[in-house]
């Protein structure tokens, strides 16, 4: 959510930003906010005048009573009661206008960074840099589900019987490899100075409203029937939610946290769920990182955060590239976002394995996350980034370390988490 003062003073900039995001259907919201804001300010002024008049009359009543002029005092009391009625009606209007403003402000996208390329969808995202040479093997690499099944590590049929499409059983060495990746990622981030956290896996609706747009919520979140609770789609939501309504000490900034959690997603929309495989599913595990920081530090943190993901993948010899997300591919709260993509030797192309975003103060405004200083308080900036998200990461790992004999070499950094195992061999 943007600053209403900024919108009030710069409506043309806000409208131009909406156009850059190809959301012209939202242009009317700016004028409507200005209209309701004007009405609310007039009502606020009237309320101040009524309260001032009431205070003056109340003092006069006291003087009249002390001087024995009870009848005159009673007449003024009647006038005060009339003012109270007007104030009640006025306050009702204040609340109504505030709700009208908020409902519209929540739909207006955050101001994107000047460096964001303009484009309607992810086909217009711009490559920033490649890291590592893409592997082009002379032998055929099987589909990732086939590799996992050859290692007796995946059972999709059983998962389908138990839960339907979009779920899986990981078994044996593949399950161990999955855990090894997450354990390595956890230690990697702790060594970067981040505080490890295991957060709640459900959040209330007011936190959902604070961390994402309605469109994102509808496409992603599972609601618990009969409860004001939603299953998290990423631990970023509950980690950022930890700071909801908090007044943070400037001396304790920044807050840098990393967490492991299961994630649950509807995956509604154009992509949907894979019929067979583990690339896009309803339930998966992820190591996430978030930063809550001073506004002037957020862009430095943004560059650090995506570089950590690149470093993690390169430590396992997986080639990656970074992409600058274009304006139309940014969710409404994001000012700038960078995707990290891993190389797929089987498909001979890159695929998304993580995303880093700077939301500037948009999320903090929704959640009321402020920094305390001597002269007033101000909103913090929030950022989030995927450290690693198995099983997508497993797809990249298995394909890039697949050998012609069907075995898979374990990257050296993961071997301590696999009991020293160097290679996974197909089961006969």
Task: Annotate each language-model stretch with its function.
Residues 1-134, 149, 153:
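N-terminal alpha-helical targeting/anchoring segments
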Residues 27, 130-428:
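TRNA-recognition modules of translation machinery and tRNA-sensing kinases, especially anticodon-binding
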